[in-house]
């Protein structure tokens, strides 16, 4: 179901963010900082979709 899929995708995205933050400490090229920005944007979008889905289910 859509709510479950959004929740799982958000969980995976947040786990990736945690890992990238660790990797960024040893990264001199900045690739992980770029990935962190991308994943934060993805997490925000997923959270927004999850909120909308939950609000629609509550009606």
Outline where the language-model segments fall.
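Iron-associated oxidoreductase/ferritin-like identity signal
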Residues: 1-59
